[in-house]
Structure formats: structure tokens, C-alpha cells
Design a protein with these regions (language model features):
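Conserved SGNH/GDSL esterase-like catalytic core that processes O-acyl groups on lipids
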Residues: 22-27, 32-118
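Alpha-helical cap/lid subdomain in secreted, periplasmic
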Residues: 20, 78-182
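Generic structural marker for isolated residues within well-ordered, non-membrane alpha-helices
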Residues: 5, 47, 124
Length: 182
């Protein structure tokens, strides 16, 4: 995780070292970004920690929505949530996207997997429309616990398929992938 923050710091610094306005970093995602299950999330969610590391020259926004899916036909599409609208209005100079884990739900991936890459690219494009100079970082999904109640139902295999789809998006868009867990 420290390596991730070092990469983020270097990329952020390279974007606008001379800028007088704060550099805006939009953290887009699900409950992991939001900080669900993290003790004292207002202090310990990763966007808050990132803000502390980057300092006063940056404004980090936490636009995580618990349960959000990347898939537009998923059970809780991120693009239909208020957090998405808020993230667009924020118009980040850097956009960190960490979505996909909730798409492993049996209501989502088996039915709409063919739309995942297109939906992901459309999400990126929507942020480019509000800030054409935005820089993107796409996060690999968090590891899936074998204690998860759906682990044996196919979720484990879908998780790997989604990881591969995320890598395809990153390659197609020329966007750097990051990993919170290496």
C-alpha cells in the first residue's frame, strides 16, 4: 500500500508542480473507497489518508458509494448514484477509480459481463468531458476473501475475469493500473 501512495504522490506532483490552485484528486469507488468497515473512517479511509500525505496543495474528494457497481445494469450502478454526480462536479485533475468488486454479484456479472469494458470506458469518458486534462489511475480490485458467502458460487472465477477486464480497459485507454494490496 505504501508503494501505491508513492506512485500516487509522484504522479500528482508531475501533473501541476507549478499550479497555484489546489490539485483535485477524485477517489471514485465503492465501499472500499468510502471506508465501510474501517474503524473511524473519517480519519482512516484511504482518501483521507491520501489527503494527509499530499498536503495543502491538494484537495482529495471521497466519492465512494457502498455497494456500487461499475456495470450500468448492475444492482446499484455507480453512474446512477449521487456520489457520481458529485465526482463529476468536483472535476478532478486526477481520478482514481476502484470499482468492480460488487460486479461479482450473481445478479450482475453472469448477465452483463459483455458490457463491463464498454461501461468502464464510458465512465472514464464522462470524467474526461468535465476535465479533458484529467489523469486517471485504475485500481485492481481488492482480493476476494474465501470467507465471503458467495465465494464458492462462482464469484471467485468472476473476480478474476473482472480483473482481466479492468486490465483491458487500462491498456485500451493508456491508463496506469495501481494495486492497493502489493
Amino acid at each position: 500500500m505504501n508503494r501505491l501512495f508513492l506512485i500516487l504522490l509522484l504522479l500528482v506532483g508531475a501533473i501541476c508542480a507549478q499550479a497555484q490552485e489546489k490539485i483535485r484528486v477524485a477517489c471514485v469507488g465503492n465501499s472500499i473507497t468510502y471506508g465501510s468497515g474501517v474503524a473511524n473512517r473519517e480519519v482512516n479511509a484511504y482518501p483521507v489518508k491520501l489527503q494527509g500525505m499530499l498536503g495543502d496543495g491538494y484537495e482529495v474528494g471521497n466519492f465512494g458509494r457502498p455497494g456500487a457497481t461499475l456495470l450500468n445494469k448492475g444492482h446499484r450502478p455507480y453512474t446512477q448514484q449521487q456520489e457520481y454526480k458529485d465526482a463529476l462536479a468536483f472535476a478532478g485533475d486526477i481520478v482514481v477509480i476502484h470499482l468492480g468488486i460488487n460486479d461479482t454479484d450473481p445478479r450482475n456479472w453472469p448477465n452483463y459481463q459483455d458490457e463491463f469494458i464498454e461501461d468502464y470506458r464510458a465512465l472514464i469518458q464522462s470524467f474526461r468531458q468535465v476535465n479533458p486534462k484529467a489523469r486517471f489511475l485504475i485500481a485492481r480490485m481488492t482480493p476476494l476473501s474465501d470467507r465471503h458467502w458467495r465465494y464458492e458460487s462462482g464469484t471467485r472465477d468472476w473476480h478474476e475475469e473482472i480483473q482481466q477486464a479492468i486490465a483491458c480497459v487500462a491498456k485500451a485507454e493508456g491508463i496506469q493500473m495501481i494495486n492497493f494490496f502489493e
